[in-house]
Amino acid sequence: MDILGISAYYDDSAACLVRDGEIIAAVQEERFTRKKHDARFPRQAIQYCLSEAGIDVEHLDIVTFYDKPFVKFERLLETYIANTPKGFRSFLSAMPVWLKEKLYLKSLLKKELKQVDGCVKNKLPQLLFAEHHQSHATSAFFPSPFEKAAVLCMDGVGEWATTPVWQGKE
């Protein structure tokens, strides 16, 4: 099974291709663009990963994104409501990008994937969204040498949780 993981639209966009549980290639977009902390869609990183695996987009089984935008949007709305009227200015500055792009992330990702070299426009793989911290945890656990481990993620931002704990099992 070939799975492409994508991180984009935040600091350090990147792509990683995993085949049957083994990392085939992983690279940040800034390695190609020479733009530090490049947040754009990682088209060149994806192309590199696909090239290393010897496949095209249409041969991927799954493409996964590191975040669940609707869950994050819910957190933002509830946070702004809880801090009204103090956070109103911040709310107004954040909403345009959410209403224009982030709530339509699935469509945007599909559009971007269709621009990757070798993509057959009507043959996109399944697109999944993982929870932000689950993405951190799985990327730490699965490449590790352990069959079973406690996995702690401490991060200041995500959908809701900031310090989740999991039990990793092969």
Which stretches of residues belong to each language-model region?
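Short acidic/glycine-rich loops and adjacent helix/strand connectors
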Residues: M1-E170
